[in-house]
Amino acid sequence: MAPNLRIKKACDAMKLLGISETKTRAFLRKLLKTYENNWDFIEEDAYKVLLDAIFDEADAQSTEKNKKEEEKKKKEEEKKSRSVATSRGRRKAPEPLVQDEEDDMDEDEFPLKRRLRSRRGRASSSSSSSSSYNNEDLKTQPEEEDEDDGVTELPPLKRYVRRNGERGLAMTVYNNASPSSSSRLSMEPEEVPPMVLLPAHPMETKVSEASALVILNDEPNIDHKPVISDTGNCSAPMLEMGKSNIHVQEWDWETKDILNDTTAMDVSPSSAIGESSEHKVAAASVELASSTSGEAKICLSFAPATGETTNLHLPSMEDLRRAMEEKCLKSYKIVHPEFSVLGFMKDMCSCYIDLAKNSTSQLLETETVCDMSKAGDESGAVGISMPLVVVPECEISGDGWKAISNMKDITAGEENVEIPWVNEINEKVPSRFRYMPHSFVFQDAPVIFSLSSFSDEQSCSTSCIEDCLASEMSCNCAIGVDNGFAYTLDGLLKEEFLEARISEARDQRKQVLRFCEECPLERAKKVEILEPCKGHLKRGAIKECWFKCGCTKRCGNRVVQRGMHNKLQVFFTPNGKGWGLRTLEKLPKGAFICEYIGEILTIPELYQRSFEDKPTLPVILDAHWGSEERLEGDKALCLDGMFYGNISRFLNHRCLDANLIEIPVQVETPDQHYYHLAFFTTRDIEAMEELAWDYGIDFNDNDSLMKPFDCLCGSRFCRNKKRSTKTMQILNKA
């Protein structure tokens, strides 16, 4: 595919996720430079590498922005606290309580007048019958004084709520203080008629605006009068005095401009008036999604604890939806353009109803009733009463949801059985790789599968019909063990054949090492003086039937070709070894587990990756090295399962007494330079036991392709004698 078409395709894919073409092209240039114009890594898994790069930078910018905002906010709070302290220092000291009526009224009148001056330009007066005045009326209207006691009666406060910087609806607060009640500085709470939040006039209410009542107190409230804050960008409906209750609107994600059913609550002065200089967010419950019939609903309850409400605010549902979709995209790689968190929750409600209707185990006779007033008491909102919310009982706990989210098929449906993965230790997930059920050539490896490569003497094209193992006479595919095959009728390795392979791998007295005149591993280092060959272990191999044979796929001599069939699981080990592979069922001795899958590389290609500091998981196919006088570089092959592979990449190392052994298997070609590397059990294995094999690593060889590491296998035959103190501590705990 031409580069321009690939760039256009990548930009189109990012546009579906709301990422601009300019940003996409900028990150593509960086990635192409990093991967040396290799598009394969960029395009795999629906541009995961590109998405990770974009969102990682976005997270970094967001973190820096939040840090700057916090510093700015901190400076503003310090400035505000200094100004408040200065103003309080200039205030006149309070007079004794025993004074004449005029002095008492002056003391009571002072904070009310100052409160009006502090909001000049935003507040206007209003009559006791709720009729509003304009600014001219406010300027020309004289103050009326009571001739009997000389007390000034203040009109009710009226403020305009700003919506996105524009003046909006008025909030009126009545001053019901009578001369007799205000002539003394009484410390008893005064009864105030309830307040009501009326629906707004036909105006569009944006979801992104705040939908909670935030109570702010600028100074200590000594007269126990209700103080209503002017929240600037608050989108609350008009606040008036009346005899009905407050109605708090609930916002729906889809119907942005339609108000849902209201939740009623009574507000008393003790609960409505802020007693400190902190912002306090009232407890809230928001309906996120529901089924079509409304029988099942998903609600979000927000009730911050006392002392933890500083700088908290209720986010809008639109912001929550976007944040959740971004999290699903980053954490779970959900890139489908039609995916929606809202749709997912609605489907969950529908599924719950379907299961409830189809369930025959028991009827829904019990329901959990949540008293929202208790939640209000716990959050510090004393005196707030809400209707009871009925929620159906749910048996899934938090740990249950974690287990469900971690149980996934890591094979992506490529194998005969599902292989789940789970992490019960921390929040890590398996590293990214492309799952493949078969090995493929990367570039230069001369691996060719052709029918002509097999002669009639090398296959059973004429002698066998269905199952070679069921035949009384051994065919050309036999290898000379017992009746000619390595497998039993049960699909296990024969005892004699398996023990021979174990002995040649572990018993130095029975090992046969072959030495190359010029070892491909040394030649690939590109040094002037080659090191002598360190030797390659000769291994016995299995020969399976193939397409040219007359038998069927069910032939007993096609065990590796039929693939995995055991119940396995990838898990995070608790002993510091990272990810591992374990069995979920008991396995007999000689059972096939899996084969090592990866990219088929030449040794020079593998060393090139090492020179470029690219991570690798190599396995050298050297079972027949040394049998030729000179092995050409392109015929010396290996497998690398780092970027493309299967579950064998999770198998950990164990020195000498591992419960798995690797055996070469010839299938598609008689050429001994390439073969399958299959893993079989060396003994009976219990369920939940970790599977491991001996990497054959020399811990004293620093020039090896597989770099030495601190071995944590725990075997008493461990070859890593020079362990660090940290390694010994881990082994002792295990």
Swiss-Prot record:
Domain Pre-SET: 460-563
InterPro entries (UniProt xref): Pre-SET_dom, SET_dom, SET_dom_sf, SUVR4/1/2, WIYLD_dom_sf, WIYLD_domain
Residues given in the record as Zn(2+) 3 binding sites: C464, C545, C551, C555
Segments forming domain Post-SET: 707-723
Amino-acid positions noted as binding Zn(2+) 1 in the UniProt annotation, renumbered to this chain: C460, C464, C468
Region (Disordered): 61-163
Superkingdom of source: Eukaryota
Record: residues binding Zn(2+) 2: C477, C545, C549
Biased amino acid composition, Basic residues: 113-122
GO biological process: methylation; regulatory ncRNA-mediated gene silencing
Gene Ontology cellular component annotations, sorted alphabetically: chromosome; nucleolus
Ranges where the SET domain occurs: 566-696
Annotated GO MF terms: histone methyltransferase activity; identical protein binding; zinc ion binding
Localisation per UniProt entry: Nucleus; Chromosome
Keywords, in A-Z order: Chromatin regulator, Chromosome, Metal-binding, Methyltransferase, Nucleus, RNA-mediated gene silencing, S-adenosyl-L-methionine, Transferase, Zinc
Biased composition (Acidic residues): 98-109
Basic and acidic residues bias spans: 62-81
Assembly information from the UniProt record: Interacts with SUVR2 and itself.
Functional summary from the UniProt entry: Probable inactive histone-lysine methyltransferase that acts as regulator of transctiptional gene silencing independently of histone H3K9 methylation. Contributes to transcriptional gene silencing at RNA-directed DNA methylation (RdDM) target loci but also at RdDM-independent target loci.
Family listed: Belongs to the class V-like SAM-binding methyltransferase superfamily. Histone-lysine methyltransferase family.
Entry comment, domain topic: In the pre-SET domain, Cys residues bind 3 zinc ions that are arranged in a triangular cluster; some of these Cys residues contribute to the binding of two zinc ions within the cluster.
Protein name: Probable inactive histone-lysine N-methyltransferase SUVR1
Organism: Arabidopsis thaliana (Mouse-ear cress)
Lineage: Eukaryota, Viridiplantae, Streptophyta, Embryophyta, Tracheophyta
Gene expressing this chain: SUVR1
